[in-house]
A protein has these predicted regions:
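Hydrophobic alpha-helical segments
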Residues: 1-5, 114-117, 206-209
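Acidic, low-complexity proline/glycine-rich segments
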Residues: 1-22, 165-176
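Alpha-helical bundle segments that constitute or directly flank the non-heme di-iron/ferroxidase center
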Residues: 10-15, 30-59, 78-79, 129-139, ...
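Short, charged/polar, low-complexity loop and linker segments
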Residues: 21-27, 115-117, 180-187
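Active-site-proximal alpha-helical scaffolds that flank and shape metal-associated catalytic sites
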Residues: 66-166, 198, 202
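Acidic, carboxylate-rich catalytic segments that either coordinate divalent cations
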Residues: 192-221, 234
Length: 234
């Protein structure tokens, strides 16, 4: 199921994992100011991303799913958010200012509303499909960059965080859980999950565009509002 979802969204997926900003991070040539702006938005994004995973746990059908999702949430709360805060400090930013007065830009806000809505109103598989492109794409974009880490330690450390074996193992757990929960989906279920996955992947591209200072592009398909066939949870 997870591989089918990724293959159905190949153009957006390729745009996310090979974005010009990602390539500049790998080369160590991205201006620090640009990377700082990325972290200012990503910290806000990750807080709601963690909330979305918490909502998905509430829909988990069994203890095995709760176990996998709890590790996923723990990685975000205990590793990734603190790392983003530390990166922001290294780049001269103020995490305290983000906590006090940080404001989501439109793409960040729209993306997180999609995650929270789908995770609250949909099934466990729906919610997991929504949050998966973020986790999975970061592992995939970092893996090839591990072969030649940039000289700049900020960029090298960021790549290593997502290119490590531990992160890859976590992604494998998450994709395996989705494969189990979704099972052999019928055409209607496959269309719904594909829609959710595609929306999240397009938002990943838009987030990179926003951080890089580019127009967001078409991003979300005009259908908008709910997956094909029915709204999640209805």
């Amino acid at each position: 199921m997870s591989l089918d979802l990724r293959e159905r969204g190949t153009p957006a997926w390729a745009a996310a994992v090979s974005h010009p900003m990602v390539r500049q991070i790998g080369a160590g040539t991205l201006p620090h100011e640009t990377f700082r702006g990325y972290f200012e938005q990503n910290i806000l994004y990750l807080e709601d991303y963690a909330r979305a995973i918490g909502l998905i746990i509430g829909h988990a059908p069994d203890v095995e799913a709760i176990d996998v999702l709890s590790r996923f949430l723990q990685q975000i709360v205990s590793t990734e958010i603190p790392a983003n805060v530390a990166f922001l400090r290294r780049l001269g930013g103020s995490p305290a200012a983000i906590s006090a007065t940080g404001t989501m830009l439109p793409v960040t806000y729209s993306y997180t509303r999609h995650l929270l809505y789908t995770s609250a109103q949909g099934s466990c598989a729906d919610g997991l499909t929504a949050v998966l492109p973020c986790q999975w794409s970061y592992g995939e974009l970092a893996t090839p960059l591990m072969a030649a880490l940039p000289d700049d330690p900020v960029y090298a450390d960021w790549v290593a965080m997502f290119g490590s074996g531990g992160y890859s193992a976590l992604v494998a757990e998450t994709t395996a859980l989705l494969d189990r929960l979704a099972g052999p989906a019928d055409a209607a279920a496959m269309a719904r999950l594909s829609w959710i996955f595609d929306i999240s992947t397009r938002y990943e591209v838009q987030f990179w565009d926003m951080a890089y200072g580019e127009p967001a592009g078409d991003g979300v398909p005009a259908a908008g509002g709910a997956p094909p066939g029915k709204e999640p949870g209805r």
